[in-house]
Amino acid sequence: MLYSSRGDPEGQPLLLSLLILAMWVVGSGQLHYSVPEEAEHGTFVGRIAQDLGLELAELVPRLFQLDSKGRGDLLEVNLQNGILFVNSRIDREELCGRSAECSIHLEVIVDRPLQVFHVDVEVKDINDNPPVFPATQKNLFIAESRPLDSRFPLEGASDADIGENALLTYRLSPNEYFFLDVPTSNQQVKPLGLVLRKLLDREETPELHLLLTATDGGKPELTGTVQLLITVLDNNDNAPVFDRTLYTVKLPENVSIGTLVIHPNASDLDEGLNGDIIYSFSSDVSPDIKSKFHMDPLSGAITVIGHMDFEESRAHKIPVEAVDKGFPPLAGHCTLLVEVVDVNDNAPQLTIKTLSVPVKEDAQLGTVIALISVIDLDADANGQVTCSLTPHVPFKLVSTYKNYYSLVLDRALDRESVSAYELVVTARDGGSPSLWATARVSVEVADVNDNAPAFAQSEYTVFVKENNPPGCHIFTVSARDADAQENALVSYSLVERRLGERSLSSYVSVHAESGKVYALQPLDHEELELLQFQVSARDAGVPPLGSNVTLQVFVLDENDNAPALLTPRMRGTDGAVSEMVLRSVGAGVVVGKVRAVDADSGYNAWLSYELQPETASASIPFRVGLYTGEISTTRALDETDAPRQRLLVLVKDHGEPALTATATVLVSLVESGQAPKSSSRASVGATGPEVTLVDVNVYLIIAICAVSSLLVLTLLLYTVLRCSAMPTEGECAPGKPTLVCSSAVGSWSYSQQRRQRVCSGEGKQKTDLMAFSPGLSPCAGSTERTGEPSASSDSTGKPRQPNPDWRYSASLRAGMHSSVHLEEAGILRAGPGGPDQQWPTVSSATPEPEAGEVSPPVGAGVNSNSWTFKYGPGNPKQSGPGELPDKFIIPGSPAIISIRQEPTNSQIDKSDFITFGKKEETKKKKKKKKGNKTQEKKEKGNSTTDNSDQ
């Protein structure tokens, strides 16, 4: 029942006051109820859930709690209906004593979200205590000679109730001698007394028995009585008289023991014993007064003998009497009022109740961490308390009610920075000097999963040798999570993806807890040079957070692949490769070539060739190129040389340890009249090598003759066209014109337009290209070397170096298989004793200048899986130092490329011949001679015909 009203005539003003108070309650956010004391168990107090705006269904889930601040379980809440009721006996006098206000302060706490409500339940007083006198009987001794209107003080009754229930009225039993003098409300210091209205006569009435009744103002009324026994004494004319009826003294509560309070003075007009006075407290004074004060019976001095406490009692009213020694003795009375002055002797008292500990680091601002109540027993400024908190912390104190504070979150928390706080709450009063008290609050910050695992690097590079054992440990990834407990428990996994037709997990795996990365199978550098993948780190928080790191695993090559020989199409019966060489060949003629590849890389794939010791004797007229594998003659062959030479060529890589392969080459020396040169593709028959060789040669001669006839006709036509353009011939550089012989195959035919452009270039001549059939004699000018000095040397006679722009073209590089690696060095020798030119090719230009044959790289438009053997007539005239060979044999093709040098600034149409990767000139000459332009127009038709053969 909220603000229950009383049914009295002043109900309307009271109702208005209650309405105003209710409006204040709503504005302050607090609830006020009232309940009478001594209410029975289960008495309804109020619908607390409804008044707080809480739904009944959420009381239990939100952990509804009721805290009565040390008042026990006087009140409880029914969580089913949200009603506040009386749980046990409430005694107002026991709770609050004689205090005018008595209330039970409750705190209602609900969670999710955390809310705190303050509820005051006022305990209404009922008239359950009757008035009580200090004693049930009081004896009075009054002399018969006392004049009328003499007053004799009495100790009044007390009522433990308050208000109207403690408002006492007195009634004296009917008699003819005395009436009762009751002080008014503004005469509280004046005691109750009997007033004599008729003279006493001891002889007539020696004793009087009166009954004093005290009645309170409660309903129903309660009463208390005391028996008054009045003894009439014989004459003692004058009673002692104090100079004041009321003495008022103020003492600080920390007054020292023995301090003089006051020295009341009484006088008696009688003489002798009738004038001697004895001082004392009244007989009905309380024991508490006797424990705090002492009165000297002779001097009347009152001193302090006990501890004074303002918080216990703010004033002491002491009845004092002075009695003479006459007979009958007469007494005088006065009252001493001792007011206790408060001093700041009580420090504040702090009580802390933690609610949300530990606090999650993502808690919202304003979250209540703890409730703090403070009490100071002093009064006024000495009892006014202010609270403060340790500075520089993410918390603050908020005053929620009188002497109540809430510790709330003021700033965002970060457990990774500070995991716990030791807070100190200081309560300081307003006294001088002020007193204070402190209390500590430990606030632990609970972790939330707000940090993802982090790797030290975003990418790691790992080097692993190939052919590793399955399951070997290759690396360990480690991620650190700044969170705690399960939020920092990191597990690792692969970010799955596919590598070709296989999944990543078939190559590597990662241990979920340790982060160790294992190779599940042997890695092969030739199959997989770089394995790039990601490892994911996830924590165990909810929701889980994660990050990825990239691993680049480079598979290092080991020398695990021996050189592999490129097998020719036809073999001899004994597995060796046979080749026939004319005895008339001179020194330096390339008669064959051993081609091998190594699947490894780097030095492990750098191949070298050498003859086996048993075959590399001085009598054998052959040698093998160290890095090219080309077999050439070391001298001119003669009749003393064995007709069949067996060569063992050892192919070795540069790995550690080196791996080798051996090729067997059978060289047959034949007379020039016995058989022409045949290629290695037709050197061996199925049943009879010699019969097959003859048949092949017949067809070969017929084909060569046909091709040669066509070539002669082409040359005649070309000569006629050249003669018709004689004015432009003078523009050619000095020297014998170089003829171009085209093969009937047509793959290496050389157009007249190309010939014209080579010849008409500015400055000195560049290297020209000559193609001819191996079965025919070389064209005039290509086999004779008398005119070569002017074509291969400049005006100073110094040998020219090869064009530095010789490179693999994109088409040549694309044709090479990924497992075939370039040899580290190919050697092109200009001549015996001359400087060498290194070529980064699989099979570089021949080091023997006599033959002038080269083979293109593997995949450069020829059959890479065939053996290539070429021989040609030796040139009796050797090139000078630094000169380049003028012919190259194209493997797999019956054509020889002849290279001659022209001036470096000549403009060449590179669309008409193969340059083996030579860079195309990016800038053409802007100025050409007018005659060249005219000649090119005339030869346009002829060049079109020639290009169609290519």
From Swiss-Prot:
GO BP annotations, alphabetical order: cell adhesion; homophilic cell adhesion via plasma membrane adhesion molecules; nervous system development
Chain segments annotated as transmembrane: 698-718
Signal peptide: 1-29
Key words, A-Z: Calcium, Cell adhesion, Cell membrane, Glycoprotein, Membrane, Repeat, Signal, Transmembrane, Transmembrane helix
Ranges where the Cadherin domain occurs: 30-133, 134-242, 243-350, 351-455, 456-565, 588-678
Cellular component GO terms, alphabetical: plasma membrane
Cytoplasmic topological domain residue ranges: 719-950
One Pfam short name: Cadherin
Membrane disposition: Single-pass type I membrane protein
Compartments, record wording: Cell membrane
Extracellular domain ranges by topology: 30-697
Spans annotated as 5 X 4 AA repeats of P-X-X-P: 734-894
Sequence ranges of the PXXP repeats: 734-737, 799-802, 832-835, 873-876, 891-894
Record SUPFAM superfamilies: Cadherin-like
Region: Disordered, residue numbers: 770-808, 827-856, 871-950
Polar residues composition-biased segments: 789-798
InterPro entries reported for this sequence: Cadherin-like_dom (IPR002126), Cadherin-like_sf (IPR015919), Cadherin_CBD (IPR031904), Cadherin_CS (IPR020894), Cadherin_N (IPR013164), Protocadherin/Cadherin-CA (IPR050174)
GO molecular function: calcium ion binding
CDD domains: Cadherin_repeat
Main localisation: membrane
Glycosylated position list: 254, 265, 548
Basic and acidic residues composition-biased segments: 909-923
Biological role: Potential calcium-dependent cell-adhesion protein. May be involved in the establishment and maintenance of specific neuronal connections in the brain.
This protein's name: Protocadherin alpha-9
Species of origin: Homo sapiens (Human)
Gene this protein is translated from: PCDHA9
